[in-house]
Amino acid sequence: MVINQRSIRTIFKHSVLAALLCASLPSVATEKICAIYPHLKDSYWLSVNYGMVSEAEKQGVNLRVLEAGGYPNKSRQEQQLALCTQWGADAIILGTVDPHAYEHNLKSWVGNTPVFATVNQLDLDEEQSTLLKGEVGVDWYWMGYEAGKYLAERHPKGSGKTNIALLLGPRTRGGTKPVTTGFYEAIKNSDIHIVDSFWADNDKELQRNLVQRVIDMGNIDYIVGSAVAIEAAISELRSADKTHDIGLVSVYLSHGVYRGLLRNKVLFAPTDKMVQQGRLSVMQAAHYLRHQPYEKQASPIIKPLTPKTLHDDTIEESLSPSEYRPTFSIKAVD
């Protein structure tokens, strides 16, 4: 077939126009994942954030991150769920402020957007549970149990009464309730005696005030607490010249607790591998949206840590790099 010059120019012109039009249109839609945390006040959730951000970059998805500012802020988190849907999220990863917060009304906040629970247990009724497409996390009963087991083995029945104070965080939020239950179960046949329990949100100043009250009691052998409480206790015990009088046991790991373990200021902390949990949650959402197989219930293995058992691979799966700062938005690169 013979094509004259005019036809060639016309074809070329139309080809250029088509190319320009295609260039001006978005590429194949990239998945939009919205992640909501209870807070970013400590390095636990910072490490979850690092895991999510690094996995979002690996998976090539858009990630938006919101945080509620604390476990008491249920209404703020509800508004953030609505913001995620307004943003056009294809999936929502939810670290709930309360296990029962959305038990009967999750759909009213997210519509039909698929939800993936991360770290904190999310209890839903039969109707709401159709939205739940994946869960990542460990049962924090076992985090508390590991901490209690460590102390029970050091102070078995008949060894002499050992007094402890509990500073586990907010009374009924996050993993506090299962941690408390697990801890009590582990120490029930030991000489561990709980003198008092103090409750407050995981805010540095609130926990520092509680630590000072415990020090003033004068009869405490160990403080068992959240990472925020234990980090505060390290400095407060040093100031009070009581570092060698009161032992510190954390019920989870943070950067400050890790440094305390390295320096023998903290005796014990279990880790549920926060970085790994963040990665797994994004992986679940991305695979679901791409119709790829994935593990619907993913749970890292809890590792007990002492100053003598700090393995690099476990720490890398648990803590963000020291220079890392919270990241709230990742845009996929075409």
Q: Can you describe what each PLM-predicted range is?
A:
Residues K32-G51, E55, Q59, R64-Q80, ...:
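Extracytoplasmic "Venus flytrap"
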Residues C34-Y37, G88-T96, P114-T118, A165-L168, ...:
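Periplasmic-binding protein-like
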Residues Y44-V61, M143-Y150, G174-I192, A232, ...:
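Short, solvent-exposed amphipathic alpha-helices that sit
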Residues L63-G88, D196-M217, I230-A233:
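Structural motif
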Residues L94-G111, F183, A200-G260:
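Hydrophobic alpha-helical
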Residues P99, H104-W142, S254-L267:
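Flexible loop/hinge segments that line or gate small-molecule binding clefts
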Residues G134-T162, Q207, L253-V257, K273-R290:
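Hydrophobic alpha-helical segments within soluble ligand-binding/sensing domains
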Residues L167, R171, Q276-D334:
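Hinge/cleft segment of the Venus flytrap/periplasmic-binding protein
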